[in-house]
């Protein structure tokens, strides 16, 4: 069982175990040992978002990697998908991202990409942990010319802008569109506005003044109300909101209504079916996706395959089945024809291309899917346990499932990145499912000593 790595790398409060400089250095040493193979000079890319603690962790990781005789390529603040892309395009041995994605600035994280730009498999992360905790590489200390060097890649952002624009159809541009763009004071604060402006859009940018502590603070994809208000104030055609590391995106239409990841996947997947380019007419989503997505895909002649929550599991299923589109309700979308991981700006470009090609507003395109009412309630628990072993909880859940009569569902799962139990209900009557979700959350909190949060 993994001790350090969760569903999206190592994550926690910066400067508190395991997110300390000492552990970052150990992780760097273990990674360098694993990716070092043969006599040639090896290179690992390090990128980050705009958190204050990024400087500390970047320096520690760099020291650990160089101390094992591996060179480091520093790209500075860059979206997570940009780090994956540059790792692959520069033929580096691995890429490291220092980010806690949509979490507040106090948190930070470390996650890896392999040389092909995909996230590491569980086995490699387990190997890294074994090297750290067994201390068996502590005595390995290259000296003299064998010590690694660090280089700064000054044009990393420009390279990624060029790549992103290359994914947009050559016969289209964004002229005539007014876009509100919220970069969450995060990693895409320079890249995203440049991409949309260079393609011809009028861009109203918010969340583009990072100061180390304002990443995701009342802005970005977790706060679409900010972008929604700006769209209405400026009479914009739509709003695009990224999270701190720009691997996810949420939209609002011209009326300020939120268009989430499920609807975006429905728009893109049905368009790809029409063009004959959706492989096996199959979309890969997670168990959190609304049943309305399944209905929309079936109507278009496609199907949805569901995985566990986490974009890494979506990508694994896509690679295993040979599919080219997948994503999550939260706004992670993977277009494998273009990139290897969730990419907020790239996903936005694909939606904008559909709007421009068909000369339709986002509100029109969003009608392709009608979501079933869905309610999510979180319970903060001190530790994870099997709630179905508590008779009162199990009975209530079974009773609710019986009431839904196959026209909805109950999904209960632990978060992979936070100490939360997520209780999600779908059904035709929002009042009923909200009441039942709160009932389940209350009894879980009562029996297991937690705190319910609607």
UniProtKB/Swiss-Prot annotation:
SUPFAM superfamilies: Phosphoglucomutase, C-terminal domain, Phosphoglucomutase, first 3 domains
Any one GO MF annotation of this record: magnesium ion binding
NCBIfam families hit by this protein: glmM (TIGR01455), PRK10887.1 (NF008139)
One Gene Ontology term, aspect cellular component: cytosol
PTM sites of type Phosphoserine: 101
Protein name as catalogued: Phosphoglucosamine mutase
Source species: Citrifermentans bemidjiense (strain ATCC BAA-1014 / DSM 16622 / JCM 12645 / Bem) (Geobacter bemidjiensis)
Encoding gene, per UniProt annotation: glmM
Cofactor-binding details, from the entry: Binds 1 Mg(2+) ion per subunit.
Binding site for Mg(2+): 101, 243, 245, 247
Reactions catalysed according to its record: alpha-D-glucosamine 1-phosphate = D-glucosamine 6-phosphate
Family: Belongs to the phosphohexose mutase family.
First-level EC class: isomerase
Catalytic residues (UniProt): 101
InterPro entries the record matches: A-D-PHexomutase_a/b/a-I, A-D-PHexomutase_a/b/a-I/II/III, A-D-PHexomutase_a/b/a-II, A-D-PHexomutase_a/b/a-III, A-D-PHexomutase_C, A-D-PHexomutase_C_sf, A-D-PHexomutase_CS, Alpha-D-phosphohexomutase_SF
EC number: 5.4.2.10
Main function: Catalyzes the conversion of glucosamine-6-phosphate to glucosamine-1-phosphate.
Keywords assigned: Isomerase, Magnesium, Metal-binding, Phosphoprotein
Required cofactor names: Mg(2+)
Keyword Isomerase: yes
